[in-house]
């Protein structure tokens, strides 16, 4: 699963990406320093894995991962190919969700592409480019449906829906805010709309604002209100602080976060929020050879989860031995959990839960 990091030039996007992935993307005080998209794989923080590692002392420790893509800075006119517009839109098309870095800090030494700080305008700039691109796609879809309707009247209802969606988009509203019926959702699946992708707004604050009372930052409050209105997530972060934290060892990091009154870094909150935003959960496998988290979509059944480990596991699935993470921790060992009857046998229709510890039985 991929999350694309977007933002106008000089909002702190690449600084945040560098901290997130330690990938070292060039970060400079001028537009388009990120011309080629940079890709980084990050581990999903999961304290359950750490506790399983203490229990099993495994030879190998493998957390779940997410892919983050630092996408080139965008300016107005992207949907018409201006700046790096065509590349920006093509890169957005490839990701599953968007982390939109929004500048909420004042700094005369860092230029803003529009000359002053206005996060709502910045958000609108990017959202409108995605919306304009979607309108073009909808127009082409309407043209095809109208031609098809000459021979098959069933396309008339599709045209009616597409016209309504186009009107919604032309009002400057993203597809995320459109109230799709189940049938409409099926219809639009073949036309991946950019403005329908889920969003996390990362509100980039100054170090002083981030360390103080965030509520005093009017820019952050405006972004939060907008996020609430469109059912998106918003996280206050300080890219500069995150860059410093990323260079610290675990002990110094814990002390620094405690001084800020935080339990986890902003980066970890972005990663966890991204995991949740994509509708992902983890099931766990544990033993001496390896303790590992496996990523699946919510609602995945046991055989399909087994297939994440190996296709043979899914083809020859017999049953799954399952215990909830908390039950195992309460018992202290798998042997004690089995004695108490807490290890369940589940069949092909079992829907996996987040934190299930599983041993799959199969035969091929």
Tell where the protein language model's regions lie, with residue ranges.
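Phosphate-binding glycine-rich loops and adjacent basic patches that engage nucleotide phosphates
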Residues: 12-17, 45-57, 85-109, 121-130, ...
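Conserved G1/Walker A P-loop phosphate-binding module
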Residues: 1-111, 139-140, 144
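C-terminal-of-GTPase-core extension/linker across diverse P-loop GTPases
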Residues: 2-6, 17, 144-351, 358, ...
């Amino acid at each position: 699963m991929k999350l694309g990091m977007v933002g106008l030039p000089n909002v702190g996007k690449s600084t945040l990406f560098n901290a997130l992935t330690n990938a070292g993307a060039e970060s400079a005080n001028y537009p388009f320093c990120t011309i080629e998209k940079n890709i980084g794989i990050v581990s999903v923080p999961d304290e359950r894995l750490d506790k399983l590692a203490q229990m099993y002392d495994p030879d190998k420790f493998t957390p779940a991962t997410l892919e983050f893509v630092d996408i080139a800075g965008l300016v107005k006119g992207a949907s018409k190919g201006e700046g790096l517009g065509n590349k920006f839109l093509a890169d957005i098309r490839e990701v599953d969700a968007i982390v939109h870095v929004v500048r909420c800090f004042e700094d005369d030494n860092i230029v803003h592409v529009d000359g002053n700080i206005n996060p709502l305008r910045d958000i609108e700039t990017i959202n409108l480019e995605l919306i304009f691109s979607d309108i073009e796609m909808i127009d082409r879809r309407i043209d095809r449906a109208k031609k098809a309707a000459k021979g098959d009247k069933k396309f008339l209802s599709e045209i009616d829906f597409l016209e309504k969606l186009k009107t919604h988009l032309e009002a400057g509203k993203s597809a995320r805010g459109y109230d799709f019926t189940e049938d409409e959702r099926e219809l639009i699946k073949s036309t991946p709309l950019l403005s329908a992708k889920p969003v996390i707004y990362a509100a980039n604050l100054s170090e002083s604002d981030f360390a103080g009372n965030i509520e005093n930052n009017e820019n952050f409050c405006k972004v939060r209100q907008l996020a609430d209105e469109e059912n998106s997530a918003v996280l206050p972060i300080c890219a500069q602080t995150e860059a410093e934290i990323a260079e610290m060892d675990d002990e110094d990091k814990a002390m620094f976060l405690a001084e800020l009154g935080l339990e986890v870094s902003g980066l970890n909150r972005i990663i966890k929020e991204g995991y949740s935003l994509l509708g992902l959960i983890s099931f766990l496998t544990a033993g001496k050879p390896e303790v590992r988290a496996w990523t699946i979509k919510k609602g995945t059944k046991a055989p399909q989860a087994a297939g994440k480990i190996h296709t043979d596991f899914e083809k020859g699935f017999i049953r799954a031995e399952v215990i909830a993470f908390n039950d195992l921790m309460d018992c202290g060992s798998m042997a004690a959990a089995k004695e108490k009857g807490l290890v369940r046998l589940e069949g092909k229709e079992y829907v996996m839960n987040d934190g299930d510890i599983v041993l799959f039985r199969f035969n091929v």
